[in-house]
């Protein structure tokens, strides 16, 4: 019984897992798309709160918006390129170009409002 519960929890968690970007896939993943990238660190408590909000937003977000994550400790070059110095930070990309950065925890309504104003 414990194994079944564990497997169910893993499958639910994987539904909400966002793909991690790195130097190898970064450009191809953001090119020609509306993208929100969550710059985070595993040691950052507010980043975990924002991740939960992003999971909630992912359920209601438009199909033309994709959410990715970048661990700042694993990807220092990308982090530096986009001037990320505070966490959590969301960078909104349109057609491969960074168009806006938001710092801090955002509610689902704020995420939705920001995406609508940027991508519509």
Language model features: what each stretch is:
Residues 4-16:
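Sec-dependent N-terminal signal peptides
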Residues 18-33:
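A short beta-strand-turn-helix
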Residues 30-42, 91:
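Short active-site neighborhood of thiol/selenol oxidoreductases, capturing the structured segment around
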Residues 46-61:
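Typically the conserved alpha-helix immediately C-terminal to a functionally engaged Cys/Sec
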Residues 72-81:
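Structural microenvironment flanking redox-active thiols in thiol-disulfide oxidoreductases
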Residues 82-91:
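Structural micro-motif
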Residues 92-120:
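Non-catalytic, surface beta->alpha helical segment in thiol-disulfide oxidoreductase systems
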């Amino acid at each position: 019984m414990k194994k079944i519960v564990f497997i169910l929890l893993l499958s639910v968690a994987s539904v909400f897992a966002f793909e991690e970007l790195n130097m190898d896939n970064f450009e191809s993943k953001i090119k020609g798309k509306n993208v929100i990238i969550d710059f985070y660190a595993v040691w950052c408590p507010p980043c975990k709160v924002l991740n939960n909000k992003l999971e909630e937003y992912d359920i209601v977000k438009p199909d033309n918006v994709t959410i990715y994550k970048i661990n700042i400790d694993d990807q220092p070059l990308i982090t530096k390129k986009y001037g990320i110095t505070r966490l959590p930070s969301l960078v909104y990309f349109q057609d491969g170009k960074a168009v806006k950065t938001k710092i801090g925890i955002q509610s689902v309504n704020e995420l939705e409002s920001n995406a609508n104003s940027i991508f519509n």
